[in-house]
């Protein structure tokens, strides 16, 4: 936890608003890619970015920045995972626009998920269940629970990295963009729900209640 986070109490964001902040940039990306030619005709400045995928990338970067700023204004904190993901969006998005090569933005999920997976699984090698630092405010688990949950999420992130590589290398750009919204997100939600039995089994709050 940074000194800024420690100095000011965290303000909880409603689950619905949190979902909007997380899904908003992805929805902008999907809409801009599917309506890129229309946007280019309506807003000549966007046409300067290039084709639909480049317009979508530029607006995705702007929407990501807006979501991070909104999160900071409301909570005075920036969650680690959205922050890291945002930084990668800005770097790879800038490369995409500068070089006019959509490979960079397509590889962004691969880089982010590989990074998260490697950090989580690597932390276990040093006896650290780093996932606990991310979700500790949401729920409390015993040491074994955090270890198992960290392993599962670490492997899941690596799975998403491989899946992204398969999708963008094997299918069209439009399919890849749609899969980011309508494929990856439902898979992640289902995986999260599947962890509830583990969380309930190792919950310290449940133990204290008993």
Curated annotation (Swiss-Prot):
Name listed for the protein in its UniProt record: Inner membrane-spanning protein YciB
Pfam families: IspA
Domain of life, source organism: Bacteria
Gene name of the record: yciB
Family: Belongs to the YciB family.
Keyword Cell membrane: yes
Topology term for the membrane: Multi-pass membrane protein
Ranges annotated as spanning the membrane: 12-32, 53-73, 78-98, 115-135, 148-168, 175-195
Cellular component terms (Gene Ontology): plasma membrane
């Amino acid at each position: 936890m940074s000194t800024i986070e420690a100095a000011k109490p965290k303000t909880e964001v409603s689950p619905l608003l949190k979902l909007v902040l997380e899904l908003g940039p992805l929805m902008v990306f999907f809409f801009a890619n599917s309506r890129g030619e229309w946007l280019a005709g309506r807003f000549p400045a966007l046409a300067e970015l290039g084709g639909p995928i480049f317009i979508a990338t530029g607006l995705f970067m702007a929407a990501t920045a807006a979501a991070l700023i909104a999160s900071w204004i409301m909570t005075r904190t920036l969650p680690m995972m959205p922050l890291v993901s945002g930084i990668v969006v800005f770097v790879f998005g800038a490369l995409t626009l500068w070089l006019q090569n959509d490979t960079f933005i397509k590889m962004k999920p691969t880089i982010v998920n590989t990074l998260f997976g490697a950090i989580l699984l690597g932390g276990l090698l040093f006896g650290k269940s780093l996932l606990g630092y991310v979700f500790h405010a949401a729920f409390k688990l015993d040491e074994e629970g955090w270890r198992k949950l960290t392993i599962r999420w670490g492997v899941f992130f690596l799975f998403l990295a491989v899946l992204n590589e398969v999708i963008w290398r094997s299918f069209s750009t439009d399919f890849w963009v749609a899969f980011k919204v309508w494929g990856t997100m439902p898979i992640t939600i289902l995986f999260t729900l599947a962890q509830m039995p583990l969380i309930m089994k190792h919950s310290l709050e449940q133990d204290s209640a008993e």
